[in-house]
A protein has these predicted regions:
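Generic recognition of well-ordered alpha-helical segments
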Residues: 13, 77, 81, 181, ...
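Hydrophobic residues in alpha-helical segments
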Residues: 18, 41-42, 112, 190-193
Length: 200
């Protein structure tokens, strides 16, 4: 869980609760650091460098934030989720990835004028026997449930042929949500000691 959603138990949902569904779309805000930064840029009219320093001071961003702000972190997460959901291995190197380094306060103001906001989304969709994934900043309208996902929170939207639409929501940045997910993974591994787990 810690590798994908911070405090969101999305991997267990895909591996257990949704095994009867044929998943055809996963879209989400998978990086709490960049979501925090974009939220601050939107609400406080701050520039990129200012909010990055603030995120680092609060422990949300690493000393080297390249993987977060460049989109690589979200890219790796959508690769993992897509591989689990579709049953086919997806190399993260094959995913088009664009981060938030070029987003300016002017972009945020333009989005507001349109009644929208800018979010860094990771998305993948099944198309026939194959699937497509990408990570990039998107304009998100108020009708989308992702519009209201602010601050350090993450959200993953999943669409299945029987489930329909579902959204998983939780804290996605900071040491405590990640630590909680790591402990959960360790406990899960301990419960399955000496058990062979067959994967395709």
């Amino acid at each position: 869980e810690a590798s994908c959603g911070g405090g969101i138990p999305i991997i267990r949902a895909l591996n257990s609760s949704l095994t009867a569904d044929e998943i055809d779309e996963i879209t989400g805000i998978l990086n709490g650091t960049t979501n925090y930064m974009l939220y601050k840029m939107s609400t406080e009219n701050c520039d990129f460098d200012t909010v990055l320093k603030e995120a680092q001071a609060k422990g949300y961003a690493e000393a080297d934030p390249t993987a977060d702000v460049g989109g690589a972190d979200a890219c790796r997460k959508i690769a993992i989720l897509s591989s689990l959901a579709y049953g086919k291995f997806l190399k993260y190197e094959d995913i088009y990835t664009e981060g938030i380094t070029k987003i300016t306060p002017a972009d945020m103001e333009y989005a507001k004028e349109l009644g929208m906001t800018i979010k860094l989304l990771a998305t993948s969709r099944r198309i026939g026997d194959s699937f497509y994934a990408m990570v990039a900043p998107f304009l998100v309208g108020q009708s989308s449930p992702l519009y209201s996902v602010n601050d350090v929170f993450n959200a993953v939207f999943v669409h299945g042929n029987m489930l329909g639409d579902a959204m998983f929501y939780g804290s996605g940045a900071g040491k405590l949500p990640t630590a909680s997910a790591v402990v959960g993974d360790i406990v899960d591994a301990a419960k399955h000691l000496h058990v062979n787990i067959v994967t395709n």
